[in-house]
């Protein structure tokens, strides 16, 4: 994973602001590289343009730290690459993926139809990424995010063009690059009309309607004699195989972290609410990892004085954190994991915020601005800056949970009955269960849709959710978590896994036609629940869904009247 910053200016090379450089280095602490070059637009007497490329690197692929930006000295072309190309053209990538991508792009630039060839290379990539590629021969800038928008890329057209993993400021000119295609900017045209709007090239040139240019949505309604989902249903066996295949490149061969302790060989951590989606990932990851590697489970809980006051719980009491829904389910699922995989070295990291060592109530911070609390105030402004251009109370609630979870510092224990001690995870890879609710009917609105109009209404609702995956706030989440020099990976959003899920008949994923009273397991995400049961986790299989901001209690800390759509006050 990397940090990207690119500027195109008319008058001179633009320096990188120090705060931006610092944030980029937080994302990629292993290397900082800069390349400057001039572009000579192919329109006669136009003045040259000044291009500055900056990349920082978090080295997670290959056997060495690969320096960026990539640059081809003879041509002057350059690439800033932030992502993980798990496959190119359907084939697994060996070694460093950025090097492989740049090699293919330079070969494509030599072809007669170079623009189409460059687009074809990028279309063939499977995995999360954001990139900026300068094709010097044609004076074109090509940039974008993967079709699911799993990595951050922002742009600003004030006084030139800036492309960056993070915003330099909270100026309203910063916007997200949409994950709707590959953007190609002809610098010859842009030099004459820099205000011209960008238009993307499509991710796919295939005819026919597809979801996210990945697969065709299955609209088939269940036949009258459709068998109810059981543990032996083909889709339960298939989801285990598909999810395992998705996990393999994401958890295997992760380099040893720089802060490696010989007594603690831990390279993978899980954003762990104790819910169904993340616990299944942890359980399957345990099947894949070598026996000497540990798995850290990061569970975050916030002190919410509004709820504490309502419940009559002391804001200074330990029970504030232990009463959080995600802490309760986290401990329960942790116990189940240690029971079904006793040989694995599990570690539950309880991240409580504010830390228990601090006895100043968070109400003093948020509702009484005149009360100093410098550490928390500093974090608040940092989180607001990172999540920008998103700026609502809902954004802040979610970003808080992800930001402090990714920091990975808390009280840890290796067994439910073991003593706790302060701990910081060395793992640089975070696994997230995001995507399962959209694919398998896990939201509250899905049973409501079924009650309203049967399977037809349910299919329409799921299609809307899946179609919006590329427009989810994954860029915001990437900025919040990557700040700590860690990379989040989404096994449920693997392209091949998504393709299988959307092409699978709906009754083989969430058979709302068969009630919970018949099977003992609720219909939403039933295929995943049955997998959890097959993996020996009967309690996890019956766990209810909660949104992250409510499970960790970051929502409505100050007032129950606060709406998620309200704009925040920096």
Give residue ranges: language-model regions.
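Cysteine-centered catalytic environments shared across enzyme families
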Residues: 1-344
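Short helix-capping/linker segments at secondary-structure and domain boundaries
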Residues: 11-12, 91, 108-112, 140, ...
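A structural signal for well-ordered alpha-helical segments within the folded catalytic domains
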Residues: 14, 99, 177, 237, ...
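Short, flexible loop/turn elements at secondary-structure junctions
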Residues: 57, 85, 133-135, 147-148, ...
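Active-site- or binding-pocket-proximal scaffold segments within functional domains
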Residues: 91, 114-117, 121, 352-353, ...
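Hydrophobic/aromatic beta-strand patches that form the interior of the parallel beta-sheet core
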Residues: 132, 142, 162, 296-298, ...
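ATP-dependent adenylate-handling ligase core
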Residues: 301-420, 427, 445-455, 478-487, ...
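Mid-to-C-terminal catalytic subdomains of enzymes
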Residues: 422-570
């Amino acid at each position: 994973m990397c940090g990207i910053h690119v500027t195109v200016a008319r008058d001179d090379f633009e320096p990188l602001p120090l705060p931006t450089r610092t944030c980029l280095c937080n994302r990629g602490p292993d290397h900082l590289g800069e390349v400057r070059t001039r572009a000579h637009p192919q329109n006669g007497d136009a003045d040259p343009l000044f291009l500055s490329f900056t990349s920082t690197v978090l080295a997670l692929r290959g056997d060495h730290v690969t320096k960026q930006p990539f640059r081809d000295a003879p041509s002057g072309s350059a690439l800033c690459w932030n992502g993980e190309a798990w496959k190119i053209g359907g084939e697994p990538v060996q070694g460093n993926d950025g090097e492989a991508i740049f090699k293919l792009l330079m070969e494509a630039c030599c072809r007669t139809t170079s623009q189409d060839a460059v687009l074809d290379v990028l279309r063939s990539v499977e995995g999360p990424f954001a990139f900026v590629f300068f094709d010097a021969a044609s004076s074109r800038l090509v940039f974008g995010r993967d079709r699911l928008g799993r990595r951050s890329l922002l742009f600003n057209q004030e006084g030139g063009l800036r492309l960056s993993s993070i915003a330099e400021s909270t100026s309203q000119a910063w916007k997200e690059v949409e994950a709707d295609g590959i953007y190609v900017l002809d610098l010859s045209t842009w030099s004459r009309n820099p205000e011209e709007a960008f238009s993307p090239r499509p991710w796919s040139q295939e005819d026919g309607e597809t979801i996210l240019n990945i697969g065709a949505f299955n609209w088939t309604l269940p036949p009258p004699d459709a068998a109810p989902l059981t543990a032996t249903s083909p889709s339960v066996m298939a989801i285990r195989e598909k999810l395992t295949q998705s996990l393999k490149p994401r958890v295997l061969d992760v380099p040893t972290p720089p802060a490696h302790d010989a007594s603690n060989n831990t390279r993978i951590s899980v954003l762990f609410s104790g819910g169904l989606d993340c616990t299944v990932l942890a359980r399957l990851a345990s099947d894949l990892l070598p026996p000497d590697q540990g798995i850290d489970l990061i569970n975050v809980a916030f002190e919410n004085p509004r709820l504490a006051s309502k419940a009559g719980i002391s804001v200074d009491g330990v029970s504030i954190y232990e009463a959080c829904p995600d802490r309760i389910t986290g401990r329960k699922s942790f116990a189940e994991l240690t029971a079904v995989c006793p040989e694995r070295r599990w570690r539950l990291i309880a991240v409580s915020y504010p830390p228990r060592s601090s006895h100043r109530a968070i109400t003093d911070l948020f509702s009484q601005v005149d009360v100093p609390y410098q550490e928390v105030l500093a974090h608040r402004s940092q989180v607001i800056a990172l999540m920008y251009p998103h700026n609502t109370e809902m954004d802040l609630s979610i970003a808080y949970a992800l930001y402090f979870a990714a920091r990975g510092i808390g009280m840890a224990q290796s067994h439910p009955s073991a003593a706790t001690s302060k701990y910081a995870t060395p793992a640089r890879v975070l696994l997230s269960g995001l995507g399962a609710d959209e694919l398998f009917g896990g939201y509250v609105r899905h049973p409501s849709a079924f009650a309203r109009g049967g399977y037809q209404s349910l299919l329409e609702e799921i299609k809307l959710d899946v179609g919006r995956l590329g427009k989810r706030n994954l860029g915001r989440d990437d900025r919040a978590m990557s700040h700590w020099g860690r990379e989040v990976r989404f096994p449920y959003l693997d392209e091949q896994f998504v393709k299988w899920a959307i092409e699978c008949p709906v009754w083989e994923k969430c058979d709302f036609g068969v009630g919970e009273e018949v099977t003992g397991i609720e219909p939403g995400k039933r295929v995943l629940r049955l997998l959890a049961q097959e993996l020996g986790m009967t309690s996890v299989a019956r766990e209810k869904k909660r949104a992250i901001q409510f499970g960790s209690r970051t929502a409505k800390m100050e007032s129950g009247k606060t709406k998620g759509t309200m704009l925040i006050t920096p």
